[in-house]
């Protein structure tokens, strides 16, 4: 302990006394106390609470602001960040609208992706998901008529021309999409089958190619077997061989065909028919052997030349017995020799089937122009096209003139509704060296009647032959005036290449457990494919809550949820070799809802309390080390389930600090020592110090949650979260305003000296001329509130010293160096009993409060006179020895109650006000009943003659006064502001009473009846330096509803216009209420400019400069006297023995610092 002499203490205070009077003025700091955890100053702004998720920006000084202003309700939001830009997708489930928002830092844009008015898609949008690895968003669609069917679509969020592409279909419901490090997505849910779309040999509905009038062969009878034309030589579309006796059909395909069979259709009304035919290979003229089923004998037979056709069947099939793979084929048909020149063969249609295909491409000659219903495929075009070069891998057509208006359309023979995939075949350009001549093509797929087409931009400069997926999903069959088709258009000035289109029927893969992994290739010309993980089939998708990749460079997964098997409980690990592994200690004993992977550490949250074997207590949250393979707790966990884990990096004191953030259904987290830290369902863990962070230590307030958005522009801190309020300051029930204009911290340093589980209820300043303060702190323990009185240093964050226990409702009375703690306690019979404790701050001892304890009833108001001897109590009170009613006076030095002369039979005093600085009389505001049954609401007490009497103007007050405040203009001129309830209407009123007794209504631009007012104060302009008004102001505190219906916890009013002073918030983001306003006399640390005030006294007639000059002379004389005594003291001290002073104030401060 340091050694101090009384001499040096006197020297110190003499110097402070001198500096104070020469450089400072006395001012009053103001503290607002109430039920709040954060606040804004001179602002009532708060966050939009309509959205389930929002986006915020934090500046370097720590303040938060809303980044995106949207007004959608019932919304889902996800985001994707790509190359420093943020893309936000908003789903309004009620309106069935999906919007894409982007460019928030420059020119914000909003683009509609889906809407109920957009008829391009069937079903209802049920959910959206965003890929955090690639700039893709996904949407799931469900169908009212197919409740067990879900479609998944996706789109690139960076494209201004959004192209929606079908991703997958499942038979069942999709719950979640998890995006993994190996460019894949895990789809989980309750489904049994999934359509892979990547099968190249699936059932083929139709396959057709481009057809030009300028065909490859000059023979007018040649036909393209992949397109459809009509033989217009006969109105009945029948072939007439009478002139030559032979019809030769030369058919070619623009791709190699593995021919399987030929089908001949007979024309039912024909009397004659084709009798014989041969199939010939045009390359060498050889006849191809065929087999067929003889309808007359029932036996299978073989033929080559003059294969016989039978006309009594609708159709007849002939199979290629030795296989035939080629681009072309020729069919030569002969009559029966009896036909005349005008007869016709009764053959209506001819079809060619590929091997392993369930459907066909056709050449039926039965399109609509021929008078038939049109059950065949066809193609059409506009513009000029030329044949490909001879070196091409297959014959194709290319647009002759770049930039010319052109189009190509393909009409498949789809007769019934189905789900399919449409693919465009692009011939490779390296074979004929045409890559530089090719550009892009726009593909529009018209899949259903009255629906907008699905559009895709396709790059045609493909090195090798490949199929490109244009569309997957529903395909409507022929209906009234509609058939599905594909339209190709050149993009910009590109030369369009056209070849063929194929339509594949969707095939499904069995997924019995509802969990499948899919490759999410971002190559638009490739299809996604299923990744086989046999080990994953041991887990059900409906039991999975999270799947996360590990950051070890391999494709390793943690999978969690609500399951139990041979690999452990609720969490398993799958390595890169597709082997499942259990976690140590048999996993966790409850469901796991979320995983967050950070380096070697993985954080788990859920509804578990221990490891699976019960050996390690975790309490809803755990950390797992991949290296040591050990579980560890975070402090002592939380008091409720954790639902989400992420990272949150925040600016604190101008530096970025990184935390692991947790969200869930909890309101406390526990330190390793067992201390509880209050939260609002969101808390931060510091992995460096391995400790929980209390919100007020961050320097700003959070009523909700904030998570980092990785990949966004590093010059900004952007977060995803939901804050029900945005406040600049975090605190525990207190906001402090200093008269020092340089002090704008608003949070007293002693707040952070208290443990986070202690809430500040009241403060007082019992120590004269020093920085010590008394604080009433409360805490909740086992649903019971306990409190204590602490001493702390108002200028240093020294750990406070606990003095004595108290009640949570206790309040302070200060008499110089004596602190009185009192509380209004109600017993089981609702009888109020007051408890008093007196503590002397100089002797550190308790005083006698027996006489004080004789006061009965509820205390509403307490003031002390300037002698620190008389305590004035107001309330619903009585004291037997003095006979006081409602208003009682306790003389502290004599420890007795003063007898007051009055004729009241009942009284309840709400406010006590000194009338002027002479301390000779005071106003008593409340409700009073005289022995004559008359009622008053404002009385005056004269201290000199000890009487209570009516005052001028009181009869005009409309009802009981709840609060009163007095503004003094001079010794005899003042105004009293009265707030109360009217007797006639029970509405609240605000009136002003002047010193002459005149009373008038005082209107402010607030909603008085909707407001809760707990304090009314008059302040001078220098008392709260942050208020930009150089005039006296009225401050209303509580919960004030302003004229625009916004709320503030305290407002300042000038000329009857009110503006927010303090907007406080509770833990849940609701508006906080100020309960009490405490003023402290303090020294200003910087010189203040004093404004001269002229007096009202005529016999002086001069400004108060005279008083100031006289005061300065007196101070100078006093300083000379004290300086002389100091010289004497120095000589005495030099020749004297030095003795320790153990009870001086400095040593007391040192004691606090060491505790």
Swiss-Prot record:
Signal peptide residues on this chain, from the entry's feature table: 1-27
Topological domain ranges for the Cytoplasmic compartment: 1127-1155
Compartment(s) of residence: Cell membrane
Glycosylated residues in this chain: 44, 61, 103, 118, 124, 156, 161, 182, 190, 213, 224, 306, 391, 413, 419, 510, 519, 554, 562, 607, 630, 713, 722, 743, 769, 793, 807, 824, 840, 848, 876, 893, 899, 916, 945, 1009, 1030, 1055
Topology Extracellular: residue spans: 28-1105
Chief localization: membrane
Transmembrane segments: 1106-1126
Membrane-topology descriptor: Single-pass type I membrane protein
Keyword entries, A-Z: Cell cycle, Cell division, Cell membrane, Glycoprotein, Membrane, Signal, Transmembrane, Transmembrane helix
Domain of life: Eukaryota
GO biological process: actin filament bundle organization; cell division; establishment or maintenance of bipolar cell polarity
InterPro entries, A to Z: Rax2-like_C (IPR024982), Rax2-like_second (IPR048266), Rax2-like_third (IPR048265)
A single cellular component GO annotation: endoplasmic reticulum
Keyword match Transcription regulation: no
Function (record text): Controls cell polarity, through the G1 phase of mitosis, via regulation of for3 localization. Required for actin cable formation where it directs the spatial distribution of the actin cables.
Family affiliation: Belongs to the RAX2 family.
Binding partners and assembly: Interacts with for3 and tea1.
Official protein name in the record: Polarized growth protein rax2
Organism listed in the record: Schizosaccharomyces pombe (strain 972 / ATCC 24843)
């Amino acid at each position: 302990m340091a050694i101090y002499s009384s001499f040096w203490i006197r020297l110190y205070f003499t110097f402070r006394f001198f500096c104070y009077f020469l450089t400072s003025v006395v001012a009053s700091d103001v503290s607002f106390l109430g039920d709040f955890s954060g606040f804004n100053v001179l602002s009532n702004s708060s966050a939009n609470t309509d959205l389930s998720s929002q986006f915020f920006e934090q500046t370097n000084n720590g303040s938060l602001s809303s980044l995106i202003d949207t007004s959608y309700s019932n919304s889902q939001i996800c985001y994707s960040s790509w190359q420093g830009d943020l893309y936000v997708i908003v789903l309004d489930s009620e309106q069935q609208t999906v919007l894409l928002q982007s460019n928030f830092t420059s020119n914000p844009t909003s683009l509609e992706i889906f809407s109920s008015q957009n008829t391009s898609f069937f079903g209802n949008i049920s959910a959206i998901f965003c890929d955090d690895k690639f700039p893709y968003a996904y949407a799931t669609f469900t169908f009212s008529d197919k409740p067990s069917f879900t479609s998944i679509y996706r789109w690139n969020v960076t494209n201004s021309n959004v192209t929606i592409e079908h991703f997958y279909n499942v038979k069942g419901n999709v719950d979640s999409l998890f995006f993994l490090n190996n460019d894949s997505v895990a789809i989980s849910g309750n489904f049994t089958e999934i359509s892979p779309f990547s099968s190249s040999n699936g059932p083929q509905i139709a396959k057709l190619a481009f057809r030009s009038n300028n065909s490859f062969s000059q023979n007018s009878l040649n036909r393209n077997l992949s397109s459809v034309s009509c033989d217009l030589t006969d109105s009945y579309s029948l072939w007439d061989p009478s002139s030559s006796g032979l019809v030769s059909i030369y058919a070619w395909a623009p791709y190699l065909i593995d021919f399987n069979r030929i089908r001949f259709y007979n024309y039912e009304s024909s009397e004659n028919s084709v009798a014989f035919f041969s199939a010939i290979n045009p390359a060498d003229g050889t006849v191809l052997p065929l087999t067929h089923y003889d309808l007359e004998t029932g036996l299978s037979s073989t033929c080559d030349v003059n294969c016989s056709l039978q006309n009594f069947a609708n159709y007849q099939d002939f199979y290629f017995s030795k296989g035939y793979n080629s681009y072309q084929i020729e069919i030569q048909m002969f009559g029966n020799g009896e036909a005349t020149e005008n007869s016709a063969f009764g053959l209506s249609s001819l079809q060619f089937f590929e091997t392993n295909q369930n459907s066909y491409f056709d050449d039926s000659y039965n399109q609509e122009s021929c008078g038939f219903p049109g059950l065949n495929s066809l193609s059409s075009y506009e513009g000029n096209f030329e044949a490909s070069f001879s070196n091409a891998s297959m014959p194709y057509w290319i647009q002759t003139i770049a930039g010319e208006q052109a189009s190509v359309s393909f009409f498949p023979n789809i007769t019934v509704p189905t789900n399919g995939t449409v693919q465009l075949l692009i011939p490779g350009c390296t074979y004929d060296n045409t890559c530089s001549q090719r550009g892009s093509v726009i593909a529009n797929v018209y899949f259903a009647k009255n629906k907008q087409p699905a559009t895709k931009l396709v790059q045609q400069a493909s090195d090798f032959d490949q199929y490109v997926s244009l569309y997957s999903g529903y395909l409507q069959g022929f209906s009234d005036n509609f058939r599905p088709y594909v339209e190709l258009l050149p993009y910009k000035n590109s030369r369009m290449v056209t070849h063929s289109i194929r339509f594949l029927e969707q095939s499904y893969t069995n997924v019995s457990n509802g969990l499948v992994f899919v490759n999410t290739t971002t190559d638009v010309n490739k299809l996604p494919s299923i990744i086989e993980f046999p080990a994953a089939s041991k887990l059900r998708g409906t039991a999975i809550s999270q799947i996360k990749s590990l950051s070890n460079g391999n494709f390793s997964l943690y999978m969690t949820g609500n399951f139990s098997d041979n690999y452990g409980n609720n969490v398993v690990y799958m390595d890169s070799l597709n082997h499942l592994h259990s976690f140590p200690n048999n996993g966790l004993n409850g469901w796991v809802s979320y995983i967050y992977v950070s380096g070697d550490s993985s954080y788990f949250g859920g509804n578990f309390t221990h490891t699976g074997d019960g050996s390690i207590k975790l309490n809803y949250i755990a950390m797992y080390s991949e290296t040591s393979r050990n579980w560890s707790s975070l402090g002592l966990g939380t008091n409720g389930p954790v639902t989400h884990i992420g990272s949150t990096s925040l600016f604190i004191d101008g530096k970025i600090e990184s935390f692991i953030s947790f969200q869930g259904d909890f309101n406390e987290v526990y330190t390793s020592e067992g201390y509880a830290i209050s939260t609002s369902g969101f808390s931060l863990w510091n992995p460096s110090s391995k400790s929980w962070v209390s919100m007020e230590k961050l320097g700003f307030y959070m009523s909700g949650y904030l998570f980092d958005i990785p990949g966004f522009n590093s010059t900004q801190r952007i977060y995803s979260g939901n804050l029900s309020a945005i406040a600049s300051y975090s605190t525990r029930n207190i906001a402090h305003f200093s008269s020092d204009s340089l002090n704008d911290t608003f949070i007293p340093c002693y707040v952070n000296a208290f443990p986070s589980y202690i809430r500040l209820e009241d403060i007082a300043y019992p120590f004269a001329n020093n920085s010590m303060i008394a604080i009433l702190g409360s805490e909740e323990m086992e649903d019971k509130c306990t409190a204590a009185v602490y001493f702390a240093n108002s200028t240093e964050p020294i750990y406070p010293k606990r003095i004595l226990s108290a009640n949570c409702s206790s309040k302070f009375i200060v008499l110089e160096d004596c602190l009185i703690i009192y509380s209004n306690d109600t017993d089981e019979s609702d009888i109020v009993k007051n408890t008093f404790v007196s503590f002397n701050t100089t002797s550190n001892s308790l005083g006698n409060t027996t006489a004080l304890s004789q006061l009965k009833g509820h205390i509403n108001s307490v003031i002390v006179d300037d002698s620190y001897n008389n305590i004035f109590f107001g309330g619903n009170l009585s004291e037997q020895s003095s006979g006081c009613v409602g208003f009682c006076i306790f003389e502290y030095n004599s420890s007795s109650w003063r007898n007051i002369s009055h004729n009241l039979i009942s009284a309840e005093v709400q406010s006590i006000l000194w009338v002027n600085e002479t301390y000779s009389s005071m106003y008593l505001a409340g409700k009073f009943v005289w022995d004559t049954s008359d009622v008053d609401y404002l009385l005056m007490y004269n201290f000199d003659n000890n009487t209570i009497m009516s005052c001028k103007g009181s009869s005009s007050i409309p009802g009981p006064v709840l609060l009163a405040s007095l503004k003094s203009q001079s010794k005899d001129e003042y105004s009293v502001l009265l707030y109360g309830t009217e007797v006639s209407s029970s509405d609240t009123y605000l009136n002003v009473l002047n010193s002459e007794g005149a009373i008038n209504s005082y209107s402010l631009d607030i909603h008085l009846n909707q407001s809760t007012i707990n304090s009314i104060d008059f302040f001078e302009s220098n008392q709260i330096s942050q208020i930009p008004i150089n005039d006296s102001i009225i401050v209303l505190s509580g919960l004030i509803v302003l004229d625009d219906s916004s709320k503030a916890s305290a407002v300042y009013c000038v000329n009857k216009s009110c503006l927010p002073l303090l907007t406080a918030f509770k833990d849940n983001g609701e508006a906080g209420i100020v309960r009490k306003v405490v003023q402290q006399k303090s020294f200003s640390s910087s010189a203040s400019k004093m404004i001269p005030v002229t007096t009202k006294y005529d016999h002086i007639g001069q400004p108060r400069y005279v008083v100031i000059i006289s005061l300065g002379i007196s101070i100078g004389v006093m300083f000379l006297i004290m300086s002389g005594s100091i010289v004497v003291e120095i000589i005495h001290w030099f020749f004297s023995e030095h003795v320790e002073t153990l009870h001086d104030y400095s040593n007391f401060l040192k004691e606090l610092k060491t505790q």
